[in-house]
Amino acid sequence: MFIAYLTAGAPDLNTTKQALLNLANDGADVIEIGVPYSDPLADGMILQKASQQALKNRFRLEQLWHLLAEIELPVPVVILAYYNQIFHYGVEKWVTTLVNLKVKALIVPDLPYEEAAILRAACARHHLHMIWLISPTTPKVRAKQLALACDDWIYLVSRTGVTGVDAHFDNQIPNMIAELKQVTTTPIALGFGIHQKQQLQLVKSWGADGVIIGTACMQILLEKGVDQLTEWISAMKKSSYP
C-alpha cells in the first residue's frame, strides 16, 4: 500500500489538481490531502512552508471541496486536518461534506482519541472512517486501543518529532509492527521520514503493509514540479510496493 500526501493549494490549486490526477493514475494506492493550517504542530519545515504558501495564496476550504467534486479519483482519498479547523467549520457539517465528496477517511493529528467522542460519533453516523496515529512513545495498551479503532489502516509514526526527510527510524518500530499484528489485521502503514528506496525495502521486511510519503512528495512538487513528482512516485512504488 503506497500512500502519497499532498498539501492542498501548494504551490497552487491547479498544481494540486494535476498532481492528484497523476498520482492517482500512476503510483498511489491512497492519496492523503492535508488542509493548509497556520499552526501545523506535526509538520516539519517543508510541510509548514507548503501550508504557508497555500494560505498566502488565500486558500479556502471551499476551493478544496470544489476540486474534489470536480475530479473523480480512482483511489481512496484521506483528509488530514487539525481539530481547530473542524471545530470552527462545524463537526457535523465537516463530516457530511467529506462523505458527500466520497472521502474515505479522516486524520486529525492533534486530537486525542479520548477527547474525540463528538467527532467519532459523527463519523460513525455518516460512515466516515477515522485513522489514528501511533508513535514509538505510545504506551502498549493505548497503541492496541488505537489500532483497534482504526478503520482503514493504522498510521504508525516512524520516530518522535515532526515530519521531514530524516532517514532515522526508531529502533522500536519492528517490534511495534509485530505486536500490533498480533491484535489486529488492519493494515499498518509507516510514515515520517520516508524518501529512499532502501527504506521501503527495510519497512517491508519488518512486515509493514504500506508507507506514507509526505515531505518528500511536497519537496519534489515545490522544487521540481508535477512531472518529476509523478516519475519519482512511480519509481518508488515499483521498487517495493508494486
Swiss-Prot record:
Q: What class of enzyme is it?
A: lyase
Q: Which Enzyme Commission numbers does its entry carry?
A: 4.2.1.20
Q: Is Plastid there in the keyword field? A: yes
Q: Which reaction does it catalyse?
A: (1S,2R)-1-C-(indol-3-yl)glycerol 3-phosphate + L-serine = D-glyceraldehyde 3-phosphate + L-tryptophan + H2O
Subcellular location per UniProt equals: Plastid, Chloroplast
Q: Which family does it belong to?
A: Belongs to the TrpA family.
Quaternary structure and interacting proteins, as annotated: Tetramer of two alpha and two beta chains.
- Mind telling me what this protein is named? Tryptophan synthase alpha chain
Q: What is the lineage of its organism?
A: Eukaryota, Rhodophyta, Bangiophyceae, Cyanidiales, Cyanidiaceae
What gene is this protein translated from?
trpA
